[in-house]
């Protein structure tokens, strides 16, 4: 990923790295914030790819396999019972494949951010363990 300005670097690299690092904390709060972070990272990556006209990350056999699986999910939702909720869930599963490719692109740019992600996971586990001990001894939940 090549950036022309610091503003572009912030929106297409720093902000997604920040969101990715906060996903463990978002998972504690529930599914909304983590799904929002995944969707934002995927959307920003798609905007970057269309802006730079760089689709080389999508020319990958794993992404093609994921697309085949995604089409299978959609066809399965249509054939089985044509439930609109099932079709909606299957249709928006493509964001996970784009999210994985976005993380690979971020790792290609600079792989030091994975260290911050592991620090966030460590802090998250530490907070959960301390909350578990507090809940065991006092009887009330902090989180």
Locations of the language-model features?
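Membrane-interfacial helix-loop-helix modules of multi-pass inner-membrane proteins that assemble, modify
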Residues: 77, 127-143
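Transmembrane alpha-helices of multi-pass, membrane-embedded glycan-processing enzymes
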Residues: 95, 118-131
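Transmembrane signal-anchor hairpin modules in multi-pass inner-membrane enzymes, especially those
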Residues: 1-84, 105, 111-115, 119-122
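Small-residue-rich segments of transmembrane alpha-helices in multi-pass membrane proteins
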Residues: 68-70, 98-100, 123-127
């Amino acid at each position: 990923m090549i950036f022309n300005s610091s503003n572009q670097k912030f929106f297409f690299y720093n902000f997604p790295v920040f969101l990715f690092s906060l996903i463990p904390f978002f998972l504690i709060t529930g599914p909304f914030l983590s799904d929002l972070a995944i969707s934002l990272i995927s959307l920003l990556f798609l905007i970057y790819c269309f802006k730079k006209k760089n689709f080389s990350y999508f020319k990958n056999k794993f992404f093609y396999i994921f697309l085949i699986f995604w089409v299978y999910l959609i066809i399965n939702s249509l054939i089985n019972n044509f439930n609109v909720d099932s079709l909606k869930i299957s249709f928006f599963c493509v964001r996970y494949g784009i999210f994985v490719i976005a993380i690979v692109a971020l790792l290609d740019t600079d792989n030091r951010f994975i260290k911050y992600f592991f620090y966030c996971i460590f802090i998250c586990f530490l907070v959960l363990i301390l909350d578990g001990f507090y809940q065991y001894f006092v009887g009330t939940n902090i989180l």
